[in-house]
Amino acid sequence: MNRAENLDSIPTDLILEIFSRMSTKSIGRCRCVSKLWKSMLGHPYFTELFLTRSSDHPRLLFGVKRERQWLFFSSPQPQDLYEKSSLVDFHMNFSDFHMNFSGDIRRNECTYVSGFIYFPRKRIKNYLCDFRVICNPITGQYAILQLITFHEKRSFLGFDPIDKQFKVLRMKYNDRGIVVHHILTLEPGKMRWRKIRCPLAHEPFWEEICANGVLYYLAEPTDGGSYVICCFDVRSEKFKFIDAKCFGDFSIQLINYKGKLGGISWKYDTVDGKRTVELYMWVLEDVEKQKWSKYVYPLPGNSYHYSVAGVTAKGDIVFVKTYTSKPFYVFYVNPEKKTFQRVEIHGNHEVFDTNNLVYAFVDHVEDLQFDVMKKTYAAKPISPPKQKPKPPSTETSSREDHQGWISISSRKYHQVRTIAHRQQGRRKFESINKFNALYLDDGDEDTVAHQQRDHHTFKSISKFKAQRLLDDDEFTGVKTSKCDTSHLQNRVTAVHELHIWSITVGKVSLASQVSIKPEADTDAILDKVIEYIKRHHVTIQVEKEQNP
């Protein structure tokens, strides 16, 4: 009996059981071995099996911000904290470095939902505009959902555990300055924003949490009433509201306390020259009657150097140090058992040698769903076309693998596309662009989406009128440093419309479509387009083709 026969004799269920005990990174590598393994490890049955297995071993997820980068780590969440004394040091190790996420990400605009990180407003490297981004911090995969429109106020990501669907709730101002609500379901095929009705006009705050299929966030009614907690049922897409005046003037962080909605805040004071810290916690005991329980716990005086990561399923409030250090500690406080535990986390990464911003999420479960989303929603990377033999090249790239082209018709319609290939060293399974193009509602005039004809991919097109773009010193809509603007007058008369097509991060792909007025100097305008792309993106090879 040869090896192939030995492998065939192993039951498939046993093979999947073995794979389910592996790490997410190892599974990603195994998917690259063969088409059979890719199909087997991407099957919904295995995805659910892996999630069930991971749920038995929740982890702490750490995000560390270093300059303009976010690095994600995870560590096993201790399960036997209370088998020893009330104050014990535990020593745990970080898992391998998972993700290096470039871009400008602000702390209060990064949320955690069912194993995924959502950035409602993220500045992508090399782009001076904001995007929505969802990522799996363990596999390093992420998807750019859409450009952010100018009038948008806030957006939240929610998860429906019954239908296993992610939805984005967006709030934006209409032409009358009133906040309107839209919902986007992340699913295969055509996706579009749907306008939904909210019975209470309100201004959303940053604090939010998604628990048991309900998205909670703090808000202030526009009529000037007391603060409320908006409860958005992700599945039914209906709103309910809870009075939040019990919080008073406290700055509240919403939490999931053993399946109940809760809020946490701090109070600092100085007594006899000593700094005191008190932890205030509210728990919603009765949703219908809106009955809250309030708890106050004294904490060590140096607790102001820590932040609340969340509450574990066992009721432990988790505190993490605000900045990286060696040693690095995590504290577990259990109000019911009146215990205070300290866990030392060992991280050998260089990021812990300096002070970098840290925040953490509790009960993190490694999930492969994003890989399945990749399989369902992924767009194949745009690749350069085959070179035509006749058209002459007017500019030559310093690198042969970067190509671009311009095609000129009798209507003076021009297209410029640049391709930047994947960075060397990235693993094959760390791909991006997981969703089909977003089709927007009629109220979104800033963005239009079209299906690419010659590829099974998509192009997300942001369409702007030239005058709007030229207000910011750059005909491409990108702000630049203040300088002599006399040259802009020619651009105003020359460029009629500019379409920016932008999809990728990692594999950067930019395509611009420019309509030029007949009286304009075609070559001069095209040279400016090429100059801009070369300056801000990649070196390209350009071909001009004149149609008869």
UniProtKB/Swiss-Prot annotation:
Report the SS bond pairs. none
In what residue span(s) does the F-box domain sit?
4-53
* UniProt-listed InterPro entries: F-box-assoc_dom_typ3, F-box-assoc_interact_dom, F-box-like_dom_sf, F-box_dom
Region Disordered, annotated ranges: 380-404
Biased amino acid composition, Pro residues: 382-392
Spell out the PANTHER family in the cross-references: BNAA05G37150D PROTEIN-RELATED (PTHR31111), F-BOX ASSOCIATED UBIQUITINATION EFFECTOR FAMILY PROTEIN (PTHR31111:SF130)
Q: What is this protein called?
A: Putative F-box protein At1g33020
Species, as recorded:
Arabidopsis thaliana
Q: What is the lineage of its organism?
A: Eukaryota, Viridiplantae, Streptophyta, Embryophyta, Tracheophyta
